Amino acid sequence: MSTSGTLTSYYVDSLILPENEELSVPRYSAGPGHQHSRQPASIGDPHSELGTCSFPSKPPVFGPSWSHVPAQFPGTVSSVYHHHYGHHQGPVGTETDGRYQSWLLEPMSGSLPMAGLPTTHHYGIKPDGLGVRSGGALPGSHTALLLSDYANGTVATAPPVEKDAVSSHTGDGVDTEEKPGLDPSKSAVYITFYLYRTYSGDRDNPVSNWLHASATRKKRCPYTKHQILELEKEFLFNTYLTRDRRYEVARLLNLTERQVKIWFQNRRMKMKKFNKDGAPKDD
């Protein structure tokens, strides 16, 4: 029961012990028979101290900026976390706390390696990076990445002046000539002239119809003399044809029913006009 009480008291003290007392008092007991100096003489309940503990505020370990990030991480984790049962540790000096001795408090190197960038280029802080950045354009095609920009949550980008300087620097010695594009109006005229010269001699070609602006009206097909004679005979007997008779006449004269119908309509209009004007007078 005493061993369990000792371990429980150690866990509680490691959480609530202030820094000044924690630095001057050893963490582990000298032996299994001795008790901790802060442990009361009589222990009734191992968990009795949990109800009255208070957690004092400590300054934050991580600063506002990332200026203490080293270039290489430690090989093992034993320097950050210490096992409770492995060995006994003496009092720690007043400069640093033993629980927070880690690579975070080591001085940083001169450059910050970028994991996503190729290894051939080195993006680091240059000695004259600040002066060149405030004065004018940065030399070269790459911009130095400053840690202050990463601390503020932004990434340094070259201003428009720097971009113009970089483009002018890369364009030295190379003559850039702008090729004039084709004028749409000239292109249309050229195509029209080419088509006109190609199809102007062939009027039967359907491609050249739009060039010659030929009429879309169907060519007139006059009736033959035999057809007109037979139609005139039929008109003398009947000025109006029935559907059956119109079909027979069209079949005999090798015409369509629509052609026969139109001819009879025109013939009736001509007769009507002739009757209206009267017969011509003989001198």
UniProtKB/Swiss-Prot annotation:
Residues 25-54, 162-181 are annotated as: Disordered. Keywords: Developmental protein, DNA-binding, Homeobox, Nucleus, Transcription, Transcription regulation. It comes from the Eukaryota. InterPro entries: Abd-B_homeobox_TF, HD, HD_metazoa, Homeobox_CS, Homeodomain-like_sf, Hox9_activation_N, HXA9/HXB9/HXC9. It is found in: Nucleus. Coiled coil: none annotated. Pfam families: Homeodomain, Hox9_act. Residues 216-275 bind DNA. GO terms for cellular component: nucleus. GO terms for biological process: anterior/posterior pattern specification; DNA-templated transcription; embryonic skeletal system morphogenesis; proximal/distal pattern formation. GO terms for molecular function: DNA-binding transcription factor activity, RNA polymerase II-specific; RNA polymerase II cis-regulatory region sequence-specific DNA binding. The keyword Nucleus applies. Sequence-specific transcription factor which is part of a developmental regulatory system that provides cells with specific positional identities on the anterior-posterior axis. Belongs to the Abd-B homeobox family. This is Homeobox protein Hox-A9a. It comes from Takifugu rubripes (Japanese pufferfish). The gene is hoxa9a.
